[in-house]
């Protein structure tokens, strides 16, 4: 699913913003809700996942599992059991820095293992100061901040090779920067938010 709006200003939408930036499973026969997994709580970085998930079958602990993989703009790869929504690899909730003016979430689900892209900035670009080493989920206020990645995995779809068991992903290694809107008007039920 997409992110909540306004996407760079979380001050008006406290909480995790349930079902945004999520993988949502519905029963194909009835349309009934099955499960969901939220990839980013209270997204202020535009870290939704615009490309489709990849479905695959894999043996784990001697049992064949029906897997689902989603590579996100956050630069993380979420691997879930597509029947239950449970992670096939660990995805602990990790404490992250806070920005009270953005009502940021206290934790984010971060998959264990190697990342697809760097999640910190080695050195500040000229004229900029780094906050929190520019790490992923660095919150920003009205003064702004740099963070990495910017659109770690964007629109290009992923591909899985069942012969090799490899997932192929087109990823970006770019620095992002944002500042909270100074005067945000409350959204109305008739507005469309694009991000």
Give a label for each model feature.
Residues 1-195:
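Beta-sheet-rich non-transmembrane sensory/scaffold domains
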């Amino acid at each position: 699913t997409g992110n909540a709006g306004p996407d760079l200003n979380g001050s008006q939408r406290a909480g995790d913003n349930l079902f945004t930036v999520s993988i949502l499973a519905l029963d194909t026969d009835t349309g009934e809700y099955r499960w969901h997994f939220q990839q980013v709580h209270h997204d202020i970085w535009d870290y939704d996942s615009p490309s489709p998930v990849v479905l695959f079958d894999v043996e784990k602990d001697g049992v064949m599992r029906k897997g689902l993989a989603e590579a996100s703009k956050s630069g993380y790869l979420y691997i879930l059991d597509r029947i239950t929504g449970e992670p096939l690899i660990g995805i602990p909730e990790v404490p992250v820095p806070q920005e009270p003016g953005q009502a940021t979430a206290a934790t984010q689900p971060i998959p264990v293992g190697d990342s697809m892209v760097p999640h910190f900035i080695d050195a500040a670009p000229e004229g900029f100061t780094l906050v929190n080493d520019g790490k992923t989920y660095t919150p920003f206020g009205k003064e702004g901040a740099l963070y990495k990645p910017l659109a770690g995995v964007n629109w290009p779809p992923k591909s899985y090779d069942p012969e090799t068991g490899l997932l192929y992903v087109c990823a970006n290694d770019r620095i992002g920067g944002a500042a909270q809107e100074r005067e945000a008007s409350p959204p109305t039920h008739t507005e469309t938010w694009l991000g």
